[in-house]
Design a protein with these regions (language model features):
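Short, glycine-rich nucleotide/cofactor-binding loops
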Residues: 21-33
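A cross-taxonomic marker for long C-terminal extensions/tails that follow the last structured domain
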Residues: 65-133
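C-terminal segment of classical bacterial N-terminal signal peptides
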Residues: 2-7
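Histidine-anchored nucleotide/phosphate-binding helix
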Residues: 30-45
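Acidic/histidine-rich, surface-exposed loop or edge segments in extracytoplasmic proteins
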Residues: 11-24, 54-57
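Short, conserved, surface-exposed binding loops centered on an aromatic residue
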Residues: 10-11, 44-46, 78
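Surface-exposed patches in mature extracellular/periplasmic domains of secreted proteins
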Residues: 44-53, 88, 132
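Acidic helix-start/capping segments at beta-turn-to-alpha-helix junctions
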Residues: 50-64, 92
Length: 133
């Protein structure tokens, strides 16, 4: 017979969030980052952990370009916590680079994933909650 598991303590509680950005509007980018910060602050106040991945594709990939209007915020968030990841769609990056006739550099904080849409599917299938600001 298997014994019942004991209660989960707050320090063991982990929340997973996938944030979807496909809009080049700086207000949307800032809202996404505000949501990330608010979620992490809320759970930290309860002694719990929040692991977040921000996935950008399509026009939202501008969030990770060198001239991003939220570049400083992304750099700061990445330095503050390894529990926030930034994922960039390789499909979008390839198409934007082809259109520009040159490789478009992205922020070092953004890791390339083969497809932003597929990454969001994988995260949700893995138990992540989904948010599209």
């Amino acid at each position: 017979m298997v014994a019942a598991a004991g209660p989960v303590s707050a320090k063991d509680k982990v929340h997973y969030l996938a944030v979807h950005v496909d809009d080049s509007n700086p207000a949307t980018m800032n809202l996404a980052l505000n949501n990330v910060q608010n979620v992490r602050t809320y759970y930290a106040s309860k002694g719990e952990k929040a692991i977040v991945e921000v996935v950008a594709y399509g026009p939202g990939l501008k969030m990770y370009m060198a001239d991003s209007p939220v570049k400083a915020r992304i750099e700061t968030m990445a330095l503050e916590s390894s529990e926030v990841q930034f994922s960039a769609c390789a499909n979008t990056h390839r198409k934007m680079s082809e259109k520009a006739g040159k490789d478009i550099p992205l922020l070092v904080e953004a890791k390339m994933v083969p497809s932003g849409v597929i990454r969001l599917i994988e995260l949700q299938e893995g138990g992540y909650s989904y948010l599209r600001p």
